[in-house]
């Protein structure tokens, strides 16, 4: 009944044109608003997917960190046990801390992340270089890969046409006795090799280099690390993987 009553006004003659026009305009506005809402939601969903993609580029599937403090001990037998797990595609050992990068007069604080040669296999960072190459070098001749924001802050040059910057990496030392503040910091040089551009949170704060260089500068023990980053095989149930890893590592 109500539908028939309303339809009369949509089909009205000239004497009721005002109602007819208002009805069609209202219908058009509602339709337009609905389309806009769908468009906004679609754009938002796409943006959410982009953000997740950017974060997954930098972060591994699983990251193991100590319950307390900044480091934990991981003996060779536990490393082998992790490597032998069926769901582990690969993993990288990490030595990480806050540092200061100095390039001549320019200085900038960063989070320095020492990684091993497996890092290329578990991270998307090497595929996000805007210039240079992904080369972490060795303990004695380390390479440095920095975020785009860090590059600008410290005026770091990686262009092969010019001499790449040699950057001083200033790090805290562990296990130092005495009250001399200078004895508690270390300085080492790393050659700038590449620049990554992912997202401001990472680009403005992170620098990657050789894990053995970082451990050497910070006086880490041979089996001491800050984290383990693990890439899981496709189809792995994350909760089950974490449970098995917990059984190996215990309460480190």
What are these model-derived regions, one by one?
Residues 2-6, 10, 51, 55, ...:
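Hydrophobic alpha-helical segments of integral membrane proteins
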Residues 9-13, 128, 248-251:
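Conserved, well-folded catalytic cores of nucleic-acid-processing
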Residues 35-37, 41-111, 117-121, 126-140:
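Hydrophobic, regular-secondary-structure patches
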Residues 89, 98-191, 216-218:
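Short acidic/glycine-enriched loop/turn elements at secondary-structure junctions
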Residues 172-252:
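Mechanotransmission and gating elements of multispan inner-membrane complexes involved in transport
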């Amino acid at each position: 009944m109500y539908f028939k009553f309303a339809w009369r006004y949509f089909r009205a003659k000239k004497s009721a044109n005002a109602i007819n026009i208002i009805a069609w305009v209202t219908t058009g506005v509602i339709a337009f608003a609905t389309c806009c809402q769908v468009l906004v939601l679609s754009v938002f969903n796409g943006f959410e997917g982009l953000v997740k993609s950017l974060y997954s580029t930098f972060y591994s599937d699983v990251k193991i960190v100590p319950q307390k403090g900044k480091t934990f001990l991981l003996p060779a037998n536990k490393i082998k046990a992790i490597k032998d797990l069926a769901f582990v595609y690969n993993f990288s050992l990490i030595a990480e801390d806050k540092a200061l990068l100095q390039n001549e007069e320019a200085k900038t604080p960063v989070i320095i992340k020492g990684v091993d040669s497996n890092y290329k296999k578990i991270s998307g960072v090497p595929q996000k270089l805007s210039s240079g190459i992904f080369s972490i070098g060795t303990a004695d001749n380390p390479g440095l890969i920095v975020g785009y924001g860090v590059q600008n802050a410290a005026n770091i040059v990686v262009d092969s046409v010019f001499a790449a910057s040699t950057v001083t990496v200033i790090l805290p030392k562990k296990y130092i006795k005495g009250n001399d503040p200078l004895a508690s910091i270390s300085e080492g040089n790393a050659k700038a090799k590449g620049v990554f551009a992912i997202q401001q949170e990472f680009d403005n704060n992170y620098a990657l280099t050789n894990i053995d260089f970082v451990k050497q500068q910070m006086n880490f023990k041979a089996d001491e690390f800050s984290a383990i980053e693990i890439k899981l095989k496709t189809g792995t149930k994350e909760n089950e993987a974490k449970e098995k890893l917990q059984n190996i590592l215990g309460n480190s």
